[in-house]
UniProtKB/Swiss-Prot annotation:
Pfam families: TRAM, tRNA_U5-meth_tr
Organism of origin: Bacillus subtilis (strain 168)
Protein name stated in the entry: Uncharacterized RNA methyltransferase YfjO
Family statement drawn from the similarity comment of this UniProt entry: Belongs to the class I-like SAM-binding methyltransferase superfamily. RNA M5U methyltransferase family.
InterPro entries, sorted: MeTrfase_TrmA_AS, MeTrfase_TrmA_CS, NA-bd_OB-fold, SAM-dependent_MTases_sf, TRAM_dom, U5_MeTrfase_fam
Organism placement in taxonomy: Bacteria, Bacillati, Bacillota, Bacilli, Bacillales
EC primary class: transferase
PANTHER family listed in its UniProt record: PTHR11061:SF45, RNA M5U METHYLTRANSFERASE
Length: 466
């Protein structure tokens, strides 16, 4: 019998060029298209564009490529204003007009729901993304690696895209100007004293990183020098030079990190001069920020985010509220004036100490904070007669712990407010809760303009059958 041979599918090879139409943006800001029904990720490509792509990586389930030529450009494509945008890995969307960034971020939330849930997404209320009037100079903290240029001078910047070569940055346009100014002057001071720069490959040298944080409302600046060893030659002279040339610096700290790691901070922190903290104000609440304290990086958008949390909680003054994964207590304190009682917990003792201090300083007698997990405290409090009406959660990128979600299903608060920094884990967690809770709406918030990140506030309401 003369059987017809089945044609083998066309396989892509690394280096091959091929045409591609970009259908959407991926969760990391890359363009997504399909070649012979296989997904292809192309950094820098935008939805609606027709491009010629060269394959850089070919896997069984997906491929990656780079743009060789744009045949038809998106009407939303703009020239990125940053001179090192192509080399630096910090921003992903400067080449996309800001109004369209906001639309695409809403779409990323929708895509995550379509991929990870069984919801009829077309019937859900996914609100327009809340953006910024000026989507630049918004970051209150910079962490610039220190290295040496080919000519031998000290440089400060970020690691390049997919590399461990430092891209020198003099004026990062998403950073607050005070952090740029401070980092630049500290870099020159280190050069004046010919400080030894840490070499990652050889694991030798002294200074690794300059970390700068500014209080937007107070103008106070903190400088942290991350060193590989406890000894820092010319320490006193460096401190004096910083104080003389940067009077706005109120806190100078040394952090010691000798480990072979990409994590910035080590465990040991030493005060070199000034205060151990700087002050920052959000709305009517002020905070003391130590070198390693977590604090939102975009104060202007944080106020909008927390106002959305308050709106979603719908407080009347009678509710018992739990702030899970509470950190230094920011969200709980933001909503405390509308609640009967707020209780927060976190596994990091230092954060809880800060939360207690912050609540006491503001005279919030209705806010209490404890160390431990929500899985431990929620059932215990419920047994003791404290049944929360509202639970607010702001988990890390990995989403909520499954035991925490099981606890929510048992305790059954009337309202559950989920603050997410990762649409994929948000969608998965909403699906897990879908038997007991309906999603009232989701409000995306743009905390990091020019990047692919999107935050969202989801309001869940207990189903009446419960």
């Amino acid at each position: 019998m003369n059987q017809q041979k089945k044609q083998a599918p066309v396989e892509l090879k690394v280096g091959q060029t091929f045409p591609l139409t970009i259908k959407r943006l991926g969760i990391n800001g890359e363009g997504v298209g399909y070649f012979k029904k296989k997904v292809v990720f192309v950094p820098g490509a935008l939805p609606g564009e027709e491009v010629v792509v060269q394959a850089t990586k070919v896997q069984p389930k997906f491929s990656e490529g780079r743009i060789k030529k744009i045949r038809k450009a998106s009407e939303h494509r703009v020239a990125p204003p940053c001179p090192v945008y192509e080399q630096c890995g910090g921003c992903q969307l400067q080449h996309l007009a800001y109004s369209q960034q906001l639309r695409e971020k809403r779409d990323i939330v929708i895509q995550s729901l379509e991929r990870h849930t069984k919801f009829k997404v077309e019937n859900m209320e996914i609100k327009e993304t809340i953006g910024m009037d000026n989507p630049w100079n918004y970051r209150n903290k910079s962490q610039f690696q220190i290295g040496r240029s080919q000519s031998g001078s000290i440089i400060a910047g970020l690691y390049g895209l997919d590399s461990h070569d430092i891209v020198p940055i003099k004026d990062c346009i998403v950073q607050h100007p005070a952090t740029n100014k401070t980092t630049g002057i500290v870099r020159r001071i280190l050069e004046d004293f010919n400080v030894s720069v840490y070499n990652e490959r050889k694991r030798k040298g002294d200074v690794r990183t300059i970390v700068t944080r500014v209080g937007f409302e107070t103008g106070e600046v903190q400088v942290v020098l991350v060193t590989a060893k406890e000894t820092l030659p010319h320490k006193e002279e460096i401190v004096k030079a910083i104080q003389k040339r940067l009077p706005e610096v109120k806190s100078i700290i040394q952090n010691v990190n000798g480990a072979k790691t990409s994590v910035i901070f080590g465990e040991k922190t030493k005060q070199l001069a000034g205060k151990t903290v700087i002050q920052e104000v959000l709305g009517d609440v002020s905070f003391e920020l130590s070198a390693r304290a977590f604090f939102q990086l975009n104060p202007e958008q944080t106020v909008k985010l927390y106002d959305e949390v308050k709106k979603a909680a719908q407080l009347t003054g009678k509710e018992k509220v739990v702030d899970a994964y509470c950190g230094v207590g920011t969200i709980g304190m933001w909503v405390a004036d509308g609640a009967k009682e707020v209780r927060g917990m976190d596994v990091i003792k230092e954060s809880i100490d800060d939360a207690k201090k912050n609540a006491k300083k503001h005279g919030m007698a209705n806010a209490t904070y404890v160390t431990g997990t929500a899985e431990h405290w929620l059932p215990k409090w419920t047994k003791e007669g404290f049944r929360p009406d509202v639970v607010i959660v702001d988990p890390p990128r990995t989403g909520c712990d499954s035991t925490f979600l099981d606890t929510i299903k048992k305790v059954k608060p009337k309202r559950f407010v989920y603050v997410s920094c990762n649409p994929s884990t948000l969608a998965k967690d909403l699906q897990t809760l879908s038997k007991d809770y309906r999603v009232d709406y989701i409000q995306p918030v743009d905390m990091f303009p020019q990047t692919a990140h999107v935050e969202a506030v989801a309001r869940l309401v207990l189903k009446s059958s419960n």
